């Protein structure tokens, strides 16, 4: 099937006309499906706009062409829609989940998340998926009737469960949450609006999750090449990318390094999309789910790479870990970024009146209990852009690292 050709809506995909609804009842739109409305609400949210100035790997002022959380999310959405189109899934729901998946990330990428997690270790830590849920259900203030965006059940369950179930049917955390438990924010929300934490998410959510992996692999290669952290030929260390590079050399023997890198990224994305689509079709053929509910109640995920492609994808991640994420240049900046977030957290804890007026409790900081104060500080810092975090640090401290 052509990548650009949409398959008929499949029985195993989510149908907006059969949505489980929203936490707060709203009349339907005359010209948009429930999932299209969700997508539009995400795009128009303040949190989505802030992704423009949140780090993917390189801090915001290192160059105009490196990815940010915003450009990454747009690229994930494009890949996810391409896969969803071939599988006959709801493209609007898939796009919504792709665009929303990073809304809970704090400034400075994973460095900021590590710092916030360490600061909150005695209080449950920090989880960006739980923070995304807070953004979507509480922290956006755009509507007179409710806090949050009041998105459909299908969108919220996809945000929370795109990587798989969180608990067993008895509510016990699965192994990945065994040490620290399922984030309390997710548990408490699910008690109010049951997200069935024990089941798999929809195919649309599973597609958005694997599209995130594809985008990370391909586009971090692109950014790493642009930054000079490695060259195209260094990627011959990975058999999959080596075979793509060899094919490019045969077809375009005189191609310059920049175009070789761009062609490598393009062909890698195409290869991974084709592989995951074929494997998912195979799994769907074997399981023959007749509805989205049967997908949720399956014994394993249905969207996946074939075994050999999964191994190749792991090799790409290992290459990037060594040559990019752990590169001295990147690590030095990320250590400073962690320190900035930790400094801000401690400062607001010690001097809560330093928070902006609209982030102070109405009764004043003195009247607030510690747990509420920590939640407020967490939400404030998690919503910062890289640029704003630096500006706040410069306002509150005598010396601020130069993240260059």
Curated annotation (Swiss-Prot):
Segments of this protein annotated with the region Disordered: 1-33
Alphabetical UniProt keywords: Hydrolase
Gene Ontology biological process: dGTP catabolic process
InterPro entries, sorted: dGTPase (IPR006261), dGTPase-like (IPR050135), dNTPase_2 (IPR023023), HD/PDEase_dom (IPR003607), HD_domain (IPR006674), PHydrolase_assoc_dom (IPR026875)
GO MF term (any one): dGTPase activity
Pfam families: HD, HD_assoc
Domain annotation HD: ranges: 69-217
Domain of life assignment: Bacteria
Disulfide bridge map: none
Residue stretches spanning the membrane: none
HAMAP family (UniProt xref): dGTPase_type2
Family: Belongs to the dGTPase family. Type 2 subfamily.
Name this polypeptide is given: Deoxyguanosinetriphosphate triphosphohydrolase-like protein
Species assigned in the record: Rhodopseudomonas palustris (strain BisB5)
């Amino acid at each position: 099937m052509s990548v650009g050709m949409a398959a008929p809506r499949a029985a195993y995909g989510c149908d907006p006309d059969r949505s489980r609804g929203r936490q707060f009842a709203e009349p339907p739109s005359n010209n948009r499906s429930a999932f299209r409305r969700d997508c539009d609400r995400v795009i128009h949210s303040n949190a989505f706009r802030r992704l423009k100035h949140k780090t993917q790997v390189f801090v915001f002022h290192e160059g105009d062409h490196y990815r940010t959380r915003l450009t990454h999310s747009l690229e994930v959405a494009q890949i996810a829609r391409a896969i969803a189109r071939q599988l006959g899934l709801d493209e609007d729901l898939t796009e919504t989940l792709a665009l929303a998946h990073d809304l809970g990330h704090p400034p400075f990428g994973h460095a900021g998340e590590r710092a916030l997690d360490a600061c909150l270790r005695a209080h449950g830590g920090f989880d960006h998926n739980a923070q995304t849920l807070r953004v979507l259900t509480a922290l956006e203030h755009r509507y007179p009737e409710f806090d949050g965006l009041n998105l459909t059940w299908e969108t919220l369950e996809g945000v929370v469960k795109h990587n798989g179930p969180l608990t067993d049917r008895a509510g016990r955390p699965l192994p990945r949450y065994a040490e620290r438990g399922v984030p309390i924010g997710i548990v408490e929300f699910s008690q109010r609006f049951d997200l069935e934490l024990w089941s798999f998410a929809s195919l649309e959510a599973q597609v958005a999750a694997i599209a995130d992996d594809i985008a990370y692999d391909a586009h971090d290669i692109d950014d790493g090449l642009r930054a000079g952290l490695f060259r195209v030929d260094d990627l011959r260390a990975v058999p999959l990318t080596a075979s793509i590079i060899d094919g490019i050399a045969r077809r375009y023997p005189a191609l310059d390094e920049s175009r070789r890198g761009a062609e490598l990224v393009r062909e890698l994305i195409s290869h991974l999309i084709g592989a995951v689509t074929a494997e998912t079709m195979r799994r769907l053929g074997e399981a023959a789910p007749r509805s989205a509910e049967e997908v949720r109640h399956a014994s394993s995920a249905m969207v996946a790479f074939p075994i050999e492609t999964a191994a190749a994808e792991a090799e790409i991640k290992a290459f990037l870990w060594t040559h990019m994420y752990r590169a001295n240049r990147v690590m030095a900046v990320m250590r400073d970024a962690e320190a900035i977030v930790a400094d801000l957290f401690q400062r607001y804890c010690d001097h809560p009146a330093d928070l902006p007026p609209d982030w102070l409790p109405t009764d004043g900081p003195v009247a607030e209990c510690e747990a509420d104060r920590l939640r407020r500080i967490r939400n404030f810092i998690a919503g910062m852009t890289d640029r704003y975090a630096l500006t706040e640090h410069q306002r509150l401290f005598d010396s601020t690292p130069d993240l260059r």
